[in-house]
Amino acid sequence: MKYDNLLDRFIKYVKVNTRSVPDSETTPSTESQEAFALTILKPEMEAIGLQDVHYNPVNGYLIGTLPANNPTLTRKIGFIAHMDTADFNAENVNPQIIDNYQGGDITLGSSNYKLDPKAFPNLNNYIGQTLITTDGTTLLGADDKSGIAEIMTAIEFLTSQPQIEHCDIKVAFGPDEEIGVGADKFEVADFEVDFAYTMDGGPLGELQYETFSAAALEVTFLGRNVHPGTAKDQMINALELAIDFHEKLPAKDRPEYTDGYQGFYHLTGLTGTVEEARASYIIRDFEEASFEARKVKVENIAQSMNAQLGTKRVLVELNDQYYNMKKVIEKDMTAIELAKEVMEELAIKPVIEPIRGGTDGSKISFMGIPTPNIFAGGENMHGRFEFVSLQTMERAVDVIIGLVCKA
């Protein structure tokens, strides 16, 4: 179905810079996210008929409710999307709209960049559709403002068509998903549902309930700096220690060599001098045993290096970030079965595969609300080559409406 306000709503949202910032001491991590919630989303939520719309300054969540209009539809379903965008330029987003895409290259504004089907063969899936792209200078922000726009549009449709019967609906828009802390302060008591869905997936049909389990690893290397001319048997180069540590990790267990259910170690940052160096990693795996084994391995490498050095010069700090939500959701597959049924009725083929990443639903599921992930349409997310199909967004709205009407 076509929805008149969907495209304009999406364009309005992505033009607001809501980029999150790691290592911030505030929630949300940036003031722009709170401003987006309070000045744009909250008034709109109230205008389209959501009730009890309120913003929680402690956790940065904006929540609203649409009560059931049929008492026999007893389920309570939630829909969640995040307001922040990823670590890429998000200032002055200037979307361009490609009507009736017919294949070939798409020049991104006046930049020297282009979307080329040879580099991005996923473009070939969108012949004849309306695509929204960047101008080559920013990301687009479909992750996850497409999800916000889809939820808003579904609610607007339901309130404008009161004869359409639906269950109780809760809506939540939250901060800081991209930096991994968005759901840390989520309050289950303020979101009383049987289950929920994050509208945060990619192409048409995605339905996901398996995520990575994730940990952050910080390794500090303590060297000893002396003049290189007299360094023999005295200098300990912290940068060399960092290189040695990295080379002791399995070379093929890196993102660029893995897919499917394979986990990895990913070096995300390396800074330092001869005196001190610091390496930042993320650790990812699907199975609990292999996830734990990866953490044990880095501890063992550090212990072995320290033993060889005769003192503690390799310091490891490990922090779990989130866990594979499959462990929770597989205990009650109602949310998955309902979504599959709705998609199939809409002639959408469910694509059930693991998320090689995480969502807010990972943490929220472990808080007691099973929260799988549904497609929102974004492609090539987190950079200048990001795009989304309007038709896929429309289908996501169809799914949301189908879920609450079938509950």
From Swiss-Prot:
Residue numbers annotated as active site: D84, E177
PROSITE patterns hit by this protein:
ARGE_DAPE_CPG2_1, ARGE_DAPE_CPG2_2
Q: Which residues bind Zn(2+) 2?
A: D143, E178, H382
- Reactions it catalyzes: Release of the N-terminal residue from a tripeptide
Record GO biological process: peptide catabolic process; proteolysis
Q: Which residues bind Zn(2+) 1?
A: H82, D143, D200
Subcellular location, record wording: Cytoplasm
Q: Which CDD domains match?
A: M20_peptT
Q: What is its cofactor?
A: Zn(2+)
Q: Which GO terms describe its cellular component?
A: cytosol
Q: Which UniProt keywords apply?
A: Aminopeptidase, Cytoplasm, Hydrolase, Metal-binding, Metalloprotease, Protease, Zinc
Family affiliation: Belongs to the peptidase M20B family.
Instruction: Please identify the protein, giving its name as recorded.
Output: Peptidase T
